[in-house]
C-alpha cells in the first residue's frame, strides 16, 4: 500500500489555504466568524485524530487533514481549530490548551516529512500522548512518488505507520 504523498496533498492544501486567504472582504470576515464558532464548538468536542506536524508543512498538513476527513474521521490541527494561538508567544496557556486537545483525541498521527525533525513540539506531543493513551501511529508523507515503505527516525520505529488504501 502507498504512503500519503506531497504530490496528492499539496493541491488539497492549497485549496484550503486559498479559501482561508480569500476571506478578507470585511474587517470581520466570514472566516473569522466561522473560526470563532469552531473554537467555541471545539472546546467540548472530541477528535478521532490529533495531527502532530511541523508548521512549515502547513499546506501538506491542510491536505492531509482533508484527505483523512474524507475517510470519515475528525482531525485536530492546532492552527486550524485554534487559530488564535500565537506561535511567537508560547506560554503555559498554550501548553494547557494542547494538553486539553490531546485528551480530547482518541489517537495521535505523527506526520513525518522533510521538516518534521525540526519541530520542537512533535516529540513532546508524541511522548505525552503515548504515555497517556498509547494510540500513536506514524503518518509518513512521501516527498514524491508513491513510495510504499517508510523508514523514519530511530524512536519512531516503535510505532506502527499509516498506509493509504487505494
What are the language-model segments listed below?
Residues 90-93, 125-126, 152-154:
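Short low-complexity, flexible loop/linker segments enriched in glycine and/or proline
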Residues 71, 104-107, 132-136:
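Short glycine-/polar-rich loops that comprise or flank the Walker A/P-loop
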Residues 1-104:
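Conserved N-terminal substructure of TIR/SEFIR domains
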Residues 81-83, 114-115, 140-147:
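Short beta-alpha junction loops
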Residues 52, 109-113, 139-140:
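Conserved beta-strand segments of the P-loop GTPase G domain that flank and frequently precede/overlap
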Residues 102-116:
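Extended, charge-rich low-complexity interaction segments
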Residues 138, 143-163:
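Glycine-rich, charge-decorated loop segments at or immediately adjacent to ligand/cofactor-binding or catalytic sites
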Residues 114-132:
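Conserved TIR/SEFIR loop-to-helix hotspot centered on a Trp-containing motif
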